[in-house]
Amino acid sequence: MINKRVLINSDSWTLLTDKTSLIQFNGDAYMYINDVAVVSADSVGFTMAKGEKYVSSTNGVYVYGKSASGADVHSVTVSEV
């Protein structure tokens, strides 16, 4: 298992993982899921609260994150299998 912390900000989507993983949000954020490695400018994500977790159960599914609280930088903890 690989554990990593990914910094996200409010300006653009950041790729969190494309592996089977457990993702924990360390600040209020948006999450976007896609089956291709492309995010359009008008993509809308799910609202995720600080401490909320998401399980990505399939390799090849791209999970992106973006901060929901202005320009503050937040992080996401990702544990990839």
Roles of regions detected by a PLM:
Residues 31-33, 69-79:
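Edge beta-strands of jelly-roll/beta-sandwich modules across compartments, strongly enriched
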Residues 14, 47-58:
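Beta-sandwich interaction modules
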Residues 1-19:
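Surface-exposed ligand/attachment interfaces on beta-rich extracellular proteins
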